[in-house]
Amino acid sequence: MNTLITPAQAVASAFTDGEYLAPEAIGEGDIAAAEQRYIVPVIGRAFHEKLLAGLHAGFTAEYLAAPVALFTRIAVQPRLDIRTGQCGTVAPKSGSYQPADAQSLRELQRSLRRQARTLLRLSLIHISEPTRLRR
């Protein structure tokens, strides 16, 4: 599957140093779905295809990698907050950590979405300037 960023890039960009997550927790399908849902409607399918082909790699790295990573996190966060196993679907809990309450999860989602949208708007400002991204 062809995506603008790799799972390792998504993890490195969307999660802070204190939040360990193995890159395998995010798949290319997660990234592709986030791109289709949040990025393509804004930049257009034709431009997205050009970016996937490697054109404007600097623009992708500087302006789109972070919002793609954050939108990917928004999409996978609910799945990361629970585990499914032989006992069904459960929230992880240990002596040191407790599952976040619903309000905290909503606030995290809002914060991530706000940051991702702001970064995506910044990319639009960049490509709307007449001297940028000609081809």
Where are these regions (language model features)?
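Short, intrinsically disordered N-terminal pre-domain segments
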Residues: 1-23
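Residue-level detector of conserved catalytic or cofactor/ligand-binding positions
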Residues: 123-133
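An exposed acidic His-Trp-rich patch
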Residues: 88-118
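Short, glycine/acidic-rich hinge or "gate" loops at secondary-structure transitions
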Residues: 49-53, 85-94
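Short, charged/polar micro-motifs that form catalytic or ligand-binding hotspots
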Residues: 24, 58-66, 102, 106
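Glycine-centered helix-coil hinge/cap
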Residues: 24-53
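Elongated alpha-helical scaffolds
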Residues: 61-89
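Small-residue hotspots
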Residues: 67-70, 74-75, 109, 115-123
